[in-house]
């Protein structure tokens, strides 16, 4: 998924669509909060994946000009 997300983020950066990037970031942060509270299964791999995706989105946001 990370490569797909990299391409999506790159597209939104190219379009200068800060709102879409913030929406993706919020979704991933919510997902991470849910994964951390999961019991009965080992969510470490999913947590690592979502954390990596958050880093990708944050990097994309950092490349946009400040508002």
What are these regions (language model features)?
Residues 1-37:
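N-terminal acidic leader/helix
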Residues 23-67:
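Short, charge-rich amphipathic interface segments used for partner binding and complex assembly
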